[in-house]
Amino acid sequence: MGTLPVRIKRLRATPLPGYMTEHAAGVDLCASLSADFVLSPGERALVPTGLAIELPPGFEAQVRPRSGLALRHGIALVNSPGTIDADYRGEIGVILINLGSAPFTVSDGERIAQMVFARCERAEFIEVEELGDTARGAGGFGHTGR
């Protein structure tokens, strides 16, 4: 597995992202809060991380949910994955939603999401009158079964 140089700036005193295991694909992002807050069932909130990054051109960062928070508490990300473009320089924010049945307290320094880095290509659109045929055709949205 190779490495990607990513410049990072702490906007507040917050932990730097880190890989939790040797072969982890994503780094954990932590909440950077002046005070803990409660996320009620059905409620969503933009949670700051206190971090900004500079990605090399041709890369994106994907902000994804943490499986443990989803399984144990019903905490998910509204836009998953969230995309951080290579030219974005603002603070990374995580839009959490409580899909569980109980209030959930978000604490300062708590690991709330993970971030994965990926190459990305820009499309060059070629307008045509017809698209090539495939066995699947236009079948979608459950056409192969439940």
UniProtKB/Swiss-Prot annotation:
Matching InterPro entries, A to Z? dUTPase, dUTPase-like, dUTPase-like_sf, dUTPase_trimeric
Cited CDD domains: trimeric_dUTPase (cd07557)
Q: Which EC numbers characterise this protein's activity in its record?
A: 3.6.1.23
Q: Which biological process, per GO, is one annotated for this protein?
A: dUMP biosynthetic process
Keyword tags: Hydrolase, Magnesium, Metal-binding, Nucleotide metabolism
Q: Please give the pathway this protein is involved in.
A: Pyrimidine metabolism; dUMP biosynthesis; dUMP from dCTP (dUTP route): step 2/2
The record's GO molecular-function terms, alphabetically, read: dUTP diphosphatase activity; magnesium ion binding
NCBIfam families in the cross-refs: dut (TIGR00576), PRK00601.1 (NF001862)
State its role: This enzyme is involved in nucleotide metabolism: it produces dUMP, the immediate precursor of thymidine nucleotides and it decreases the intracellular concentration of dUTP so that uracil cannot be incorporated into DNA.
PANTHER family of this UniProt entry?
DEOXYURIDINE 5'-TRIPHOSPHATE NUCLEOTIDOHYDROLASE
What is the protein named?
Answer: Deoxyuridine 5'-triphosphate nucleotidohydrolase
- Please tell me the species this chain comes from: Geobacter sp. (strain M21)
Gene giving rise to this polypeptide: dut
